[in-house]
């Protein structure tokens, strides 16, 4: 019997509503003739501490037997299994993880804009706030979101919710703020050149860090290219 596992980040319901019907068109029955599960990829490119083996693995099957078979596969190479009750729950787990980062990055990006308006040093504010030992998690502002996950994944969730007549306003606002950050950065550059009586046109501008994060060569969705 074959095991099919979807790892790609996607909207809630994909495994059950899209993949399963295609497989069952063959006349085979899930949980009896084949096993189907969802287990989101959780690799962090460039992370020198967390890797495939020591990053807990979310696993959920269409049936309990599917979950068990998927666990048997992954536990050969991954230390910790985290089974959840349904493929939909597993799909939302990954979306929550990346939406959490997107929303918090949007918050600190807006704080950067606020500090700029108030003529304050945002880095001083963040470092001081980071001394609080509880109830605070440090995020840093930047020119926006990049990579093949964070800029895209929240839209899977907001799209699905729109089909249910609900608008995820908080998530969509975060995406809007992050998308606008490259323009905030270019305006800062323009202002700096203007103070030096130079125009953007004709100026030599060095861009360091074209990839979406340090120590990798992936430029997908990199805000530096905007």
Regions found by a protein language model. Give the residues of each.
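Structural/interface elements that position substrates and couple domains in central-metabolism enzymes
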Residues: 1-226
